[in-house]
Swiss-Prot record:
<keyword id="KW-0805">Transcription regulation</keyword>
<dbReference type="InterPro" id="IPR017112">
    <property type="entry name" value="HXA9/HXB9/HXC9"/>
</dbReference>
<keyword id="KW-0371">Homeobox</keyword>
<dbReference type="GO" id="GO:0006351">
    <property type="term" value="P:DNA-templated transcription"/>
</dbReference>
<dbReference type="InterPro" id="IPR050803">
    <property type="entry name" value="Abd-B_homeobox_TF"/>
</dbReference>
<keyword id="KW-0238">DNA-binding</keyword>
<dbReference type="Pfam" id="PF04617">
    <property type="entry name" value="Hox9_act"/>
</dbReference>
<feature type="DNA-binding region" description="Homeobox">
    <location>
        <begin position="205"/>
        <end position="264"/>
    </location>
</feature>
<dbReference type="InterPro" id="IPR017970">
    <property type="entry name" value="Homeobox_CS"/>
</dbReference>
<dbReference type="InterPro" id="IPR006711">
    <property type="entry name" value="Hox9_activation_N"/>
</dbReference>
<keyword id="KW-0217">Developmental protein</keyword>
<dbReference type="GO" id="GO:0048704">
    <property type="term" value="P:embryonic skeletal system morphogenesis"/>
</dbReference>
<dbReference type="GO" id="GO:0009954">
    <property type="term" value="P:proximal/distal pattern formation"/>
</dbReference>
<dbReference type="InterPro" id="IPR001356">
    <property type="entry name" value="HD"/>
</dbReference>
<comment type="function">
    <text>Sequence-specific transcription factor which is part of a developmental regulatory system that provides cells with specific positional identities on the anterior-posterior axis.</text>
</comment>
<dbReference type="GO" id="GO:0009952">
    <property type="term" value="P:anterior/posterior pattern specification"/>
</dbReference>
<dbReference type="InterPro" id="IPR009057">
    <property type="entry name" value="Homeodomain-like_sf"/>
</dbReference>
C-alpha cells in the first residue's frame, strides 16, 4: 500500500490527496483491475444525438450514486481531465497520459460533464452544469444591446428640434438692443435749438395717437397760420383735399390752439422774469 501511494504521489500533491481520500483500505488488485479496464470502456458518441437535444428528457441520478457506483461505469475522461470545456472538441484533448497517470484531478463539487454515462442520464453534446449560467449572461447582453440601439425618446427629439428655434429667438433678441441704440444715436444728432427740424426728424418710440402724415400735418400748419379758426365750409374743403374727416380736422385745430396758448404763457413768464 505504501509503494502504491509513493507511486501515485509523483503526479502532484493534488492527485496524492485525491488518491488517499478515495482509495481507502481496498487491495491493490481491485484498483489495478479497475484502472486497467477504464481505457477500454470508451463509448462512442451516438450519432443520432444532436447538440440541441431536449433538456426535458434528462433525468439526473442523486449524488449518492456517484460515490457508490463502480469505477467501471464512469468514463475516465469525464473524471480526470482538467475542467476545460469546448463545445465542439471532445475526443482529443482529454485522453489520459501513456504511463497510466492522469494529468489533472477534477473536483467532485463541480458540475459533471457530459462524458459521464449513468443509467438515467441522456448523453448530449452540451454541458448541463454550465447551461443555466450561459442563459442569464446572454439575456443580459441582449438587454445591453437593446438599450444601446434603442432610439431616443420623444422628449429628446422635441428638445433637439426646438434648438434652432431657440437660437433664432436669441439672435433676434440680440438684434433689438442694437436697433434701439441706433435710434438713440439719431435722436442725439438732432439740433435742440431747431424745433422745426426736431419735429420733422423726430421718431417717437411710443404708439402714434394720430394717423396724420407729414404732408397732412404740413398743410394743416399752413392753414392754421392763415386762420386759427375754420368755418364749416372751409373745414369740409380741407378734409376733402387731405383725405381726412371733418372731425379729424376739427380735433387737430383744437389741439394746435391749445399748444399755441401754452407757448404764449411760457414766453410771457420768461419776459416777466
Amino acid at each position: 500500500m505504501s509503494r502504491k501511494r509513493s507511486k501515485m504521489s509523483t503526479s502532484g500533491p493534488l492527485s496524492n490527496c485525491y488518491v488517499d481520500a478515495i482509495m481507502g483500505q481496498d487491495s491493490e488488485d481491485v484498483y489495478g483491475a479497475r484502472y486497467i479496464q477504464a481505457p477500454h470502456m470508451v463509448t462512442p458518441r451516438p450519432s443520432s444525438v444532436g447538440d440541441n437535444a431536449d433538456f426535458a428528457s434528462c433525468n439526473f441520478a442523486p449524488k449518492s450514486a456517484v460515490f457508490s457506483s463502480s469505477w467501471s461505469s464512469v468514463h475516465p475522461q469525464g473524471i480526470y481531465h482538467p475542467y476545460v470545456h469546448h463545445h465542439h472538441h471532445h475526443h482529443q484533448s482529454h485522453l489520459p497520459s501513456a504511463d497510466g497517470r492522469y494529468v489533472g484531478v477534477r473536483s467532485w463539487m463541480e458540475p459533471i460533464s457530459n462524458h459521464v454515462s449513468f443509467a438515467g442520464l441522456h448523453t448530449s453534446g452540451r454541458s448541463y452544469g454550465t447551461k443555466p449560467e450561459v442563459l442569464p449572461l446572454k439575456d443580459a447582453e441582449c438587454d445591453a444591446l437593446e438599450a444601446e440601439s434603442r432610439p431616443l425618446s420623444a422628449g429628446f427629439v422635441c428638445a433637439a428640434a426646438a434648438c434652432p428655434d431657440r437660437a433664432r429667438k436669441e439672435h433676434g433678441a440680440s438684434e433689438l438692443p442694437s436697433h434701439d441704440e441706433h435710434k438713440e444715436e439719431k435722436q442725439q444728432q438732432l439740433d435742440p435749438n431747431n424745433p422745426a427740424a426736431n419735429w420733422i426728424h423726430a421718431r417717437s418710440t411710443r404708439k402714434k395717437r394720430c394717423p396724420y402724415t407729414k404732408y397732412q400735418t404740413l398743410e394743416l400748419e399752413k392753414e392754421f397760420l392763415y386762420n386759427m379758426y375754420l368755418t364749416r365750409d372751409r373745414r369740409y374743403e380741407v378734409a376733402r383735399i387731405l383725405s381726412l374727416t371733418e372731425r379729424q380736422v376739427k380735433i387737430w385745430f383744437q389741439n394746435r390752439r391749445m399748444k399755441m396758448k401754452k407757448q404764449n404763457r411760457e414766453r410771457s413768464g420768461k419776459e416777466h422774469i
